[in-house]
Swiss-Prot record:
GO terms for molecular function: heme binding; metal ion binding; peroxynitrite isomerase activity. It comes from Mycolicibacterium gilvum (strain PYR-GCK) (Mycobacterium gilvum (strain PYR-GCK)). A motif (GXWXGXG) lies at residues 56-62. This is Peroxynitrite isomerase 2. Its EC number is 5.99.-.-. Its cofactor is heme b. Pathway: Nitrogen metabolism. HAMAP family: nitrobindin. It catalyses: peroxynitrite = nitrate. Signal peptide: none annotated.
Length: 209
């Protein structure tokens, strides 16, 4: 077999494994359960088809930069739905030590993706809203658009910080499905000088879906 054949075979095996997984749910609730596997559960709302490739559970590693310098982190992102006109989003990350092992908890955010639905402005029908609550004490609203069928760009529109929250600037994020079906992203944030600087980047492999 060639290296190309090996890669195809490996991708097929990964797909076989991830296709059989889903997120755990309680099955005694009267409403549809969340699902991160499009093969299971309720149908995806048609309004979200342009975000379909994001649905799943993603795991991997990335690089970050803060006031103390560069660091590496591990991350899991869960993107699920319950048939409504939004996607659920939960991202958790943890710092890695120099040997690549777990060091400590890091960033965590939860929120929702949806498309703008404004009858008075049909031109906004492809605008994406991403509303996030961060564990470090602030809420952030992004707006953006799909760049193509497998990439999405968003920019901070508004920030609200709690009294105990960290002081942060706005951000720009780019997500995309890349070679091998992985989810990759980069985030730049506004620094104290008012310019966008690299903050986070990661490449995550599909674990569910």
């Amino acid at each position: 077999m060639t290296s190309g054949d090996d890669a195809v075979a490996a991708a097929a095996e990964r797909a076989r494994q991830t296709a059989a997984r889903n997120i755990p749910v309680f099955d005694d609730l009267p409403l549809p359960s969340d699902t991160a596997n499009l093969r299971e559960g309720v149908d995806l709302d048609d309004a979200l088809l342009a975000l379909l490739p994001l649905i799943g559970v993603w795991r991997g590693e990335g690089e970050g930069r803060d006031a103390h310098g560069d660091y590496r982190f591990g991350q899991q992102i869960i993107v699920s739905h319950d048939g409504a006109d939004y996607l659920n989003w939960e991202a958790r990350s943890w710092r890695l030590d120099d040997g690549g092992d777990y060091d400590r908890r890091d960033l965590r955010e939860t929120g929702f993706w949806r498309f703008v639905n404004d009858p008075n402005d049909p031109g906004e029908s492809q605008a994406i809203e991403l509303l996030l609550a961060h564990s470090s004490g602030y809420i952030e609203l992004f707006y953006g658009r799909p760049l193509n069928q497998a990439s999405w760009e968003l920019v901070t529109d508004a920030l609200a910080r709690s009294k105990s929250g960290v002081l942060v600037g706005g951000a720009k994020r780019l997500y995309g499905i890349i070679e091998g079906g992985d989810l990759a992203y980069v985030e730049e944030r506004v620094d104290a000088d008012g310019g966008l600087v690299p903050h986070l980047s990661a490449r995550l492999s599909r674990f569910v879906g």
